[in-house]
A protein has these predicted regions:
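Short beta-strand elements at the ligand-binding edges of bilobed clamshell
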Residues: 5-14, 153-156
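Accessory alpha-helical/coil subdomains and C-terminal extensions
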Residues: 11-37, 41-138
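C-terminal non-catalytic interaction/assembly regions of soluble proteins
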Residues: 108-197
């Protein structure tokens, strides 16, 4: 989560669960094609929490690319080539924030944040170019589950978490607090002043 003073927000567990399913599909697809590569772009403009957590949950991902880690495209392509030579398939999970490492901004949004194009097709093209340059054929299947990950009903864990958040909001209001957000920090529900966020 990239919200200050909030270690967990609602929807995270559901997003990870749905993303894991897409990674599973990418794994099946990559194994079902000769020299198959499943490339999955997951949400995370500035943070790779969903991508990293779904990677851990799936157990099928070979490369997890997040904006928090240094990224060297050439070194990645060499590692991917070695993986393909050895195993004949690979699954790559990448957070959309990786765009800041491999692309130039196309402008700025109203808040002043740099705007980047879609990193998924960009990386897919670079992978295909690399393998073509070394005379090796690969079949890259690109998955962009953005809306399917965002548009599902909350799972049981998130439903219970939201119920607890709402209960805490009522307790805070009844205690006379205003202009606060209910957060979750180190296992405890907290009241965070909105001006601190």
């Amino acid at each position: 989560n990239d919200i200050p003073f909030v270690s967990r927000s609602f929807g995270f567990a559901t997003a990870v669960e749905e993303a894991r399913e897409v990674l599973r599909c990418a794994h099946v697809e990559s194994k079902g094609n000769p020299n198959g590569i499943g490339l999955v772009r997951l949400m995370g403009r500035s943070a790779g929490f969903v991508c990293a957590s779904a990677t851990l949950a799936s157990g099928d991902v070979n490369f997890c690319l997040v904006p928090e880690a240094d990224f060297d495209l050439k070194a990645f392509l060499i590692s991917l080539e070695k993986r393909m030579d050895k195993r004949g398939h690979a699954v790559i999970a990448l957070a959309e924030g990786l765009a800041s490492k491999v692309m130039e901004p196309s402008g700025f949004d109203p808040s002043g944040n740099p705007k980047y194009g879609d990193v998924g097709p960009n990386l897919k093209a670079r992978i295909e170019e690399h393998f073509k340059s070394v005379s090796k054929q690969v079949s890259v299947k690109y998955f962009d589950p953005s809306y399917s990950v965002r548009s599902v009903p909350a799972n049981s864990e998130d439903s219970i978490f939201c119920w607890n958040l709402s209960r805490q909001a009522v307790y805070g209001a009844m205690a006379g607090y205003t202009e606060f957000c209910v957060g979750h920090w180190h296992g405890y529900f907290t009241f965070v002043p909105i001006k601190m966020m």
